[in-house]
Amino acid sequence: MHTIKYALLQACKVYYAYLQEHSLGCEELQVAQVVFDDPNIHIRIKAKMLNADSLMIQIGSVAPIPLNEEFGFYVRFYDEKSQILSIECLDSSVLNAVQKHKSQLKIFSDLKFLIRNLEAFFEQQNTFAIPAAPPIFAHKDSTSAYRSITTQPYLNKEQASALRDILSKPFSYVWGAPGSGKTQVVLFEALLHYVYNSTRVCVLAPTNSALEQVLQSLIKKFDTLKIERSMILRLGTPSNAFMEQYAEVCDPQILQKKQPQSLFSATSLKSRLKESLIIGMTIDAFVKRYASLDVEFAHFFLDECAFTPLIKALTLSTQNTPITLLGDHKQLMPICEMSTSHMHGDKAWANLFNLSALFMEDFFTQEHFTSSAKIFIKSQVSPLQFTHTSLNILRETHRYGDNLAKILDHHIYHNGLYGKDSPTDLFFIDCKSQPPQNKCNHAEAQVIATIFPTLLKHSNSVAVITPFVKQRKLLYEYQIPYNHTWTIHGSQGQEFEIVVFSPVMLHHHLTDSRNRHAAYALNVAVSRMKKCFILVCDYNYWIRQDEQFLTAILHCAKPYPITKTPPQKKQEYPPPTSHIIDIVPI
């Protein structure tokens, strides 16, 4: 067997076995209500989002079974607004069994199937390599005017350089902080070249929210140029908000389930694939569906590449198709449920789930592919290797004022990041000294509850972000709506006008910026903000901390006025968070 193929398959086997042995990767979702509408079952589940392919059902004392047609079920849709999961029973006996055991009905999300999909994908492949074939625009013998590279005057020098490299080099990485133009400038212009050349490309992202964020940005830009939305096709299950706004770009197979009366649901997937030039999907959807799509892509674009596990990104290395990675490796790394302390000996293969897509070049420069190869002992923050990768850095951000950009550059980026002249609104609220208990800080929660109603009057785009799951639950007890609270990890891929940050405590892994993992996590929290950042903390404690990112924020921040009486804590407990919502339960 090919040594690379063997390494990839071993990684899948080792990681799957670890999750199975430690009962990880599978979470029970809280069932709040069950309603029968023969032959359909409507189940209200407390979860923000679901992967329909991961769902399993337990009826009575019988072991959980997949919610798929093989076992007599058909998942019609999941409406995240109403939190209703709609299932069709294909067999009356199955429906009777569910009705009989209604009170014992349980729903699980088992994400281990994604590993099985990866394994099946690699089993069918025999060629693995960094792409050598350049994009079509690099062919000097082309006489087509469409195949020339055009950089518009509005691009700055770094953006123009990145665009030229994307369209002429087989493997490239565009690194930039939020607001540097990775998506709305560089990616958009690159895709525009392919659209004008009538050439199909693929846009990928590690999560549904990240995919929809990039597609929304692109659709708005295409709309301004009067380019038909039918040029874009989003495969997989979209959020309700995305479907309502952009139904014409959604997967017709999904539309037929959720919006059967929609004009766009009458089109077949085959015809949509034929007419679309930009196909968007998650990397997991690519793994599962690529073989059945029967299409060829001229270029792969992987957004949020630093959050994408290396082993999933390696699926793109099987086609000798140009690859462009876009992202920011100074933010969150992939979520791996296997501790690195267990990745040794014959378990070292699993490190491919721990490292990010940015280690692709490193992976292919290994002298051998045994479990002792250097790639299997690297950490998420090991130096990146870019000898054959065309690296472009975007140092100018229009998201932040130069006041915040300088802080970010000093503590996190170290690459000369600079921002716009007008400063970012940075505020702090001193909640006085109150020692945190069990990763909860009542003083911070109480202050946030005081200002939250006022903030909501100014903008509905308000998020309260905290590193800790327990603090998020506490915020709910203080009457902060659950859909406005996020953990740092859960907020990845989201954007808000106003971000209120509750640090709770100085914690080595999540708020102590001397630890690079914590610094990158704090960068995520700050970068969710578009206009205003409010830090709620014990001012006297944090201002005394040396070389801390949050301390630097405090030095530049202004006091935020509080006028209302603090609300009292609610007595009821918040809904339990599933593993899908809060990925890292710290």
Model-derived segments and spans:
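Conserved helicase/translocase motor-coupling segment
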Residues: 415-478, 484-485
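Pre-ATPase regulatory/linker segments immediately N-terminal to the P-loop/RecA-like helicase/translocase core
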Residues: 1-161, 227, 235-258, 351-355, ...
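Conserved helicase motor
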Residues: 235-241, 284-288, 466-470, 485-492
